[in-house]
């Protein structure tokens, strides 16, 4: 493989590692492999630290394809906790509010999910990498500044309920969506539509375009993968 000329590397990002952290580590290993100080490397779509799954890295001239990969359809599996919310819409922050759930049934969930399929408007999380006057929204939030983000048009191709436990009020979904979709925001909006609350307890990106997570390199085995290359 010619990393300096350009390659596409798909890795399975682990839990609690930022996309930039994963990129920096892989870039270091690749640069060491080819014997240069720094191989040009970029990623094609951020995954939250608490999310796992497909992260596409491009090196050299292949970084020009990053936008192309960002346009590809993505598939996720996610688990939601109903009846509560957190400021980040996931488990990065503690629960800040609780809501009734006794009215929530499988039938109601199925009915609500259909309303999110197609072209919809979605407001990104305040704890996100969206820019506000040049600053990242999450950086402003951590400084105690109020952040108001505008709703953006997104497209959801498929939204399936794969599991619902009425005892724990946990539900799992499979989502196929276009660029710019925040699954954390989708969780928040599903909670609102159920006249309750919801936040993510697990998120995994299982596909980007034709690249599936089963075909990705395990992050912990990247050095072994590089060692096997000639």
Where are these regions (language model features)?
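Catalytic/RNA-binding core of pseudouridine synthases
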Residues: 1-230
């Amino acid at each position: 493989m010619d990393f300096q000329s350009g390659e596409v590397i798909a890795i399975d990002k682990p839990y609690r590692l930022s996309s930039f952290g994963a990129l920096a580590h892989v870039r270091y290993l690749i640069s060491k492999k080819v014997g240069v100080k720094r191989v040009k490397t970029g990623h094609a779509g951020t995954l939250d630290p608490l999310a796992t799954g497909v992260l596409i890295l491009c090196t050299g001239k292949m970084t020009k394809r990053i936008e192309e990969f960002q346009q590809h359809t993505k598939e996720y599996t996610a688990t939601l906790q109903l009846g509560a919310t957190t400021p980040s819409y996931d488990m990065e922050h503690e629960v800040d509010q609780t809501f009734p759930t006794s009215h929530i049934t499988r039938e109601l969930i199925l009915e609500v999910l259909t309303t999110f399929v197609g072209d919809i408007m979605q407001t990104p999380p305040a704890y996100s990498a969206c820019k506000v006057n040049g600053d990242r929204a999450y950086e402003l939030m951590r400084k105690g500044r109020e952040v108001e983000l505008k709703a953006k048009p997104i497209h959801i191709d498929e939204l399936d309920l794969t599991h619902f436990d009425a005892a724990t009020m946990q539900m799992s979904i499979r989502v196929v969506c276009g660029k710019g979709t925040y699954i954390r925001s989708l969780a928040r909006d599903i909670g609102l539509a159920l006249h309750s609350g919801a936040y993510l307890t697990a998120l995994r990106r299982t596909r980007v375009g034709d690249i599936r997570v089963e075909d990705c390199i395990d992050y912990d085995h990247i050095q072994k993968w590089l060692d096997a290359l000639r």
